[in-house]
């Protein structure tokens, strides 16, 4: 079982990443990009946040597995 501090950190980070990703996606959907360059940049930011979230979830899974193996 992941200790409470680690679990709280992971949950807080995931919530922040998800909130940012949703906000940027809303900006994209609402036509905030006026140039293709802005569109590409915003897509890159969203992609980076998605990668960060995936890595965070993978890390949480790894920690859980390691603790279960002990």
Question: Which residues make up each language-model segment?
Answer:
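N-terminal acidic leader/helix
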Residues: 1-30
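Short, charge-rich amphipathic interface segments used for partner binding and complex assembly
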Residues: 33-65
């Amino acid at each position: 079982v992941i200790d409470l501090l680690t679990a709280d950190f992971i949950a807080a980070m995931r919530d922040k990443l998800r909130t940012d990703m949703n906000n940027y996606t809303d900006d994209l959907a609402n036509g905030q990009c006026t140039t293709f360059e802005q569109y590409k940049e915003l897509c890159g930011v969203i992609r980076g946040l998605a990668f960060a979230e995936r890595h965070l979830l993978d890390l949480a899974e790894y920690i859980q597995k390691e603790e279960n193996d002990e």
